[in-house]
Amino acid sequence: MRTATVSAGLLLVAVAVTACGAREQAAEPNPPSMQANAPVEPDTSQPVASGNTPAAADIAAVAALNASFDPKRDPVADLETAKVEAMRGGKRIMVDVGGEWCSWCHILDKFVEEDAEIRSFRDAHYVWLKVNYSEENENKPFLSAYPEIKGYPHLFVLDADGKLLHSQFTGELEKGKGYDREKFFAFLKAWAPPEK
């Protein structure tokens, strides 16, 4: 029994010494290689849907397009970002014109966010771009390139190159104090990019 205890003790000491040596080796830095310091560029030719992960900055930029109706945002630059993402993902661009002052804009946001099927369809087929229209910034230079807007929110469907395909007065998609799910979903489906 005493031999087994001594053997077990020696084994524990050997394991501890080996583990400490391994930690010391791991702590020594490896000299950096020139290749490790080279900047990594995201491959924008690959669609996000293919499983490629875009750079974190790309993700943040795309998320910001639909975050709010911000009078300080540049819709021309935002449209360029939306076009890159639309080409990358084989999507269309939905330009949502409105403002934080617009109650129907918030109703539309809530309607889409609370309906998992519509939200999922939107995310799979569209890059959603909010463009502010308010007293602070009417974005006239940008919006002058599109048909007249009759009410807010207003939706413009663009192809991935930014070409206008459709202008949608959202009043036609309303029902009572909200949006008609059947009409709204039919609108999204009608203007989604063709299946490949």
Please provide the spans of the model-predicted regions.
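Bacterial signal peptide processing site
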Residues: 20-24
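Short active-site neighborhood of thiol/selenol oxidoreductases, capturing the structured segment around
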Residues: 89-103
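N-proximal helix/coil linker or "cap" segments that precede and/or mark the start of modular domains
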Residues: 27-73
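A short beta-strand-turn-helix
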Residues: 51-53, 73-93
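Non-catalytic, surface beta->alpha helical segment in thiol-disulfide oxidoreductase systems
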Residues: 150-195
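Conserved redox-active cysteine motifs that mediate thiol-disulfide chemistry
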Residues: 99-113
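Thiol-based oxidoreductase modules, predominantly thioredoxin-like and allied folds used
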Residues: 73-76, 113, 118-138
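Bacterial N-terminal signal peptides
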Residues: 7-18
